[in-house]
Structures are given as C-alpha cells and as structure tokens.
C-alpha cells in the first residue's frame, strides 16, 4: 500500500469519526430540547392552573351557586389558554431569532479561526471554504518625529551632488590661484649672499624654481653650468624645503618657519604673523639656494649649522640663538 493510500484511509477514518460525533451531538441536543419542552409545558400548566384558581377565588364573594362558579372558572380557563397560545408564539419567534444569531456566530467563528497544518490532499482542502482575508490597517506616521538618521535615497543623492559641485568649484578656484604669478626673492649662497628676484606661478614646485634659478645664475657662477635642480637645496627661514612642494602649499597653509612665515604674499602692509617679529613682509629673509656639496662641507658652520629639514607636522619658533637676528 502506498503512502497516498494510507493517507486517504486515515483521512476517511477521521471523517467517519467526525460524522459519528456530529450525530451523537445532534441526538444529545434533541434530548435536551425535548426535556426542556416537557419541563416548560408542565410548568406552564401548573402556573396556569394556580393562577386560574386564584382569579376564581378573587371573583367569588360570599355564597355563590355551583353553576355560577363553573361559568367563572370556564371563562378564566379559556382566557388563560388564549394568553398561553400567544406567549408560545412569541417565545417560538424569539427562540428562532436566537438560534439564527447563534448559527451566524458559529459560521463566522469557523471561517475566521486559524488554519493549522493538515495532511489532507489538495482536492479535499478545496472543498472547505477559504478563510476571508482581513486587510491590515496602516498605522499613521507622526510628522513630529526626527527621521534624519534614517536612510533616504533622495537626501543622499542631493548631498552627493552638492559635494561634487563644491569639490569642482574648489578645484576651479585652486587652479585659478595656482596660475597667479608671484615675485620670489632668492639668493645664491656660497658663503656670501647674491640676491635676486624671480617671477613664478604659485603652482610651480621648488624643483621648477631651482631650474629657473640655475638658468639665471649659471652665467655668473661657473660651478652652476653643469648643475641640475637635484644638486641644489632650497632653504627658507632656516628650513630645507623638499623639492616636491609647491609655493601654493605654503601660502594656503600659512606655514611657519623658525624666523617667521615661509611665504606671505597677501599685501605689503601685513606684519609677519609672529608677535616677536621685528621685520616687515617687504624685508623678510630671501630664500637661499645652496649647492649640496657646499652644505656637506660647511654644515657645522653658522648659518648652515642651524638649517634642518622641513617637517609639516612640527611647530617651529624662535629660540635664544635667534635673538641675534633682531
């Protein structure tokens, strides 16, 4: 026997048991209704009989003939029977209405109860009525609640576009500033100062500045004819500046050296940032261009002894040895 046949037999056995229980329940209900009717009729007749006797006694005063007594009793019994008939009709109507209401409630309860797991076949389940779908009510949202922390695609897209536009605007502004020309004062240092000026763009690197300085100085100094930018050092405010930095980097960040700001090109009237500075922007120290070979030979001698590589994260300031420059 296959599993499908076993399942069908189990289903049929359960169906027979349910039918048997329904028949027994109906028989019990009939017995209960029959008992109720019997008790109700007995009570009605007993109550009616007692009521008729009381009415007859109340209507007879003193000595009454037998015929009059029988007539009064007969009239009261006929009136009572008429009232009982009317009461049965109204009670039957009420019982019928209550039975219909009860059947309706049972029908609703049957169709709204939860459907449990069943091993019945699909064709047998289709015979049963489908449970009605109760639509879920949507709970309204409170407009006063802060929802800024929740993900919002429209807001995120708006912020992304705004950031991109600001970044593009910043890049355009930076490119425009990098193309601005500035005048840089520098001096070739070989133990003595040979000061010159050079016009250069803010976006140029220190290496490019050294290359242009070589072109201007090699006519006067023969040691620079075969020199390249890698053989030179750029010293500003006692700091050795790496070649990959641009002038714009120091102007924007307002980087400070040991004796003042590295580069200030805002206006000629600006006093140097440090409060203990004694010189104006126009008289600030020019940048020194030095051969590396000369520095290696003389780095123990002043002023090369005070030079050190530039570190962006380090804060530089005057020390007691710098007071001699005032």
Curated annotation (Swiss-Prot):
Disruption phenotype: Reduced growth and mobility. Larval lethal. Residues 77-111 are annotated as: Disordered. One of its GO terms (biological process) is chromatin organization. One of its GO terms (cellular component) is nucleus. Residues 97-109 have a biased composition (Basic and acidic residues). Coiled coil: none annotated. PANTHER family: PROTEIN FAM50A, XAP-5 PROTEIN-RELATED. Belongs to the FAM50 family. This is Protein FAM50 homolog. The lineage of its organism: Eukaryota, Metazoa, Ecdysozoa, Nematoda, Chromadorea.
């Amino acid at each position: 026997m296959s599993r499908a046949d076993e399942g069908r037999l189990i289903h049929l056995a359960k169906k027979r048991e349910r039918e048997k229980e329904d028949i027994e329940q109906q028989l019990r209900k009939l017995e209960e209704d029959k008992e109720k009717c019997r008790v109700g009729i007995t009570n009605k007749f007993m109550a009616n009989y007692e009521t008729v006797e009381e009415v007859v006694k109340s209507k007879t005063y003193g000595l009454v003939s037998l015929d009059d007594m029988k007539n009064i009793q007969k009239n009261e019994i006929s009136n009572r029977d008429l009232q009982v008939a009317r009461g049965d009709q109204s009670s039957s109507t009420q019982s019928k209405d209550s039975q219909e209401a009860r059947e309706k409630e049972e029908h609703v309860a049957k169709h709204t109860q939860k459907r449990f797991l069943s091993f019945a076949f699909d064709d047998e389940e289709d015979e049963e009525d489908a449970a009605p779908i109760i639509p879920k009510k949507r709970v309204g949202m409170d407009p006063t609640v802060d929802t800024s922390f929740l993900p919002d695609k429209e807001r995120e897209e708006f912020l992304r576009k705004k950031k991109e536009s600001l970044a593009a605007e910043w890049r355009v502004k930076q490119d425009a500033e990098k193309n601005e020309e500035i005048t840089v004062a520098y001096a070739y240092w070989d133990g003595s100062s040979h000061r010159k000026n050079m016009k250069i763009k803010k976006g140029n690197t220190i290496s490019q500045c050294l290359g242009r300085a070589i072109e201007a100085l090699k006519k006067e100094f023969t040691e620079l004819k075969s020199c390249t930018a890698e053989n030179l050092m750029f010293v500003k405010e006692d700091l050795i500046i790496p070649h990959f930095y641009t002038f714009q980097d120091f102007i924007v960040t307002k980087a400070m050296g040991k004796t003042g700001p590295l580069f200030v090109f805002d206006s000629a009237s600006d006093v140097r940032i440090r409060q203990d500075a004694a010189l104006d922007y126009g008289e600030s120290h020019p940048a020194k261009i030095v051969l590396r070979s000369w520095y290696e030979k003389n780095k123990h001698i002043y002023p090369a002894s005070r030079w050190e590589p530039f570190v962006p994260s380090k804060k530089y300031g005057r020390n007691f040895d710098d007071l001699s420059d005032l």
